[in-house]
Structure formats: structure tokens, C-alpha cells
A protein has these predicted regions:
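Hydrophobic transmembrane alpha-helices and immediately adjacent juxtamembrane helices
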Residues: 1-222
Length: 222
């Protein structure tokens, strides 16, 4: 364990620089630059709100913030997993010429997506305050939930990134698994509509716990 930590510390500057370089390269590939980090999730969330909140009339008075909190947390996880699964496989060519620890590539990917997530999180705060949800003492628990999700996401990305080089076909399965998880993780529905007989299975999904924790902190002051 100490050896692995020392390795990470030794390459920490490279990790930070590569994260910055990837973010900068991404902004330079489009005219709007980093604004796409904001516009893309807003468009994504708008589609779900129009379809489920307006057309299907699934909403309640607080359905908009309810949906946005769930989608914000979900998108962070989904982005890291869908992009992170191929990080080691994609860097195999580079590692043949330069010795680099495999572990740094998933870390760089997760850090890159986390920076973009933080932009969206700030916008979510602004929206919630505008909508009438005030800052309260429960916000002190938010860093703990964020850290738990970061560690949970990192663990899943490490696993996928390590397995995909040996089972390349798995990368095509990941997106379908994420789609299934999306509908089973309480992003769009309230837990009270889940039948009592299935509540145990519903809450055995750790993503449900994370998303409900965000809502408890940001919306319900719990």
C-alpha cells in the first residue's frame, strides 16, 4: 500500500498537469470552449424534464429541482464510468514507449470529469437558491457525500479499466449496464412509488443512497 501511495505522489505533478492539459485541449476543440461543460448537461436535463415533467406529467411542484439534483449526481458517475473503462486500453500504445504506472490514467480521467462536474454543481446551487432552497447546516455534510461518490466512482473506474484490456468487448456492454442502472437508481422517481415488496432491492443499490443523500442535503434539510 505504501509503495502504491509513493508511486502516486511521485507522479502527482504529471497527473495534475495531464488533467489540466486534457481540459484545455477539450475547450480548444470547440468555439464555445468550456461553456459546453455547462450547455451539454443543461440540454440533457432539459430533454428529461420536458418528456417526464411536462409531456408525461410525472412532476410535482418540486419535481424540477428533484430531477436536476438526481441528474447532476448521475451524470458525474456515468461520465466517469463510460469514459474511464477504456483509459488503460487507450494508453497501451504510450505505455509501450514510456514507463508510466497504469493507475494514473483512470485517475486523470476521473479528475477531468470531476472538474467539469464541479462547474455544474455550482450552477445547481445557484438554481436551487433561486428556486427557494436556502443554504442550511445540512450543507456541511455535502463534502462527505461528494467524497464518498468520488471514491466509489474511482473504484468502479479502476475495476473497468483493469478488466477491459483483457475483455475488450466489455466496453460495449458498459453503456447498456449504465442505461439499466439509470432507471434503477431513483434519478427520476421518488422512493415512495416503489412497491413495498421491492424496497429492499431498491435500496441495495448504492447509487440510490447517494442520490437521495444529495436530495436530503440540498432540498429537504435532512
Amino acid at each position: 500500500m505504501n509503495k502504491k501511495l509513493n508511486t502516486l505522489l511521485r507522479y502527482s505533478e504529471l497527473i495534475v498537469y495531464k488533467t489540466y492539459a486534457d481540459l484545455r485541449a477539450e475547450t480548444e476543440r470547440t468555439y464555445l470552449g468550456f461553456l459546453w461543460w455547462v450547455f451539454e448537461p443543461i440540454l440533457y436535463m432539459s430533454v428529461f424534464y420536458v418528456f417526464f415533467g411536462l409531456l408525461l406529467k410525472q412532476g410535482t411542484p418540486d419535481y424540477v429541482p428533484f430531477l436536476l439534483v438526481g441528474l447532476t449526481a448521475w451524470q458525474w458517475l456515468k461520465s466517469c464510468l463510460s469514459h474511464g473503462a477504456e483509459t488503460i486500453l487507450g494508453a497501451s500504445g504510450l505505455m509501450q514507449h514510456v514507463f508510466l504506472p497504469k493507475v494514473i490514467f483512470p485517475i486523470i480521467l476521473v479528475l477531468t470529469d470531476t472538474v467539469k462536474f464541479l462547474f455544474i454543481l455550482v450552477l445547481l446551487f445557484i438554481f436551487l437558491w433561486w428556486y427557494g432552497y436556502s443554504v442550511n447546516i445540512t450543507y456541511l455534510a455535502l463534502p462527505i457525500v461528494l467524497l464518498i461518490q468520488l471514491l466509489f466512482t474511482m473504484a468502479l473506474v479502476f475495476f473497468l479499466a483493469a478488466v477491459v484490456p483483457f475483455l475488450p468487448d466489455l466496453r460495449f456492454v458498459v453503456e447498456n449496464i449504465l442505461l439499466a442502472l439509470f432507471f434503477m437508481s431513483g434519478v427520476m422517481i421518488r422512493s415512495d412509488i416503489v412497491p413495498e415488496a421491492y424496497q429492499h432491492y431498491y435500496y441495495s443499490n448504492p447509487i440510490v443512497i447517494l442520490i437521495e443523500s444529495y436530495r436530503d442535503i440540498l432540498m429537504y434539510n435532512v
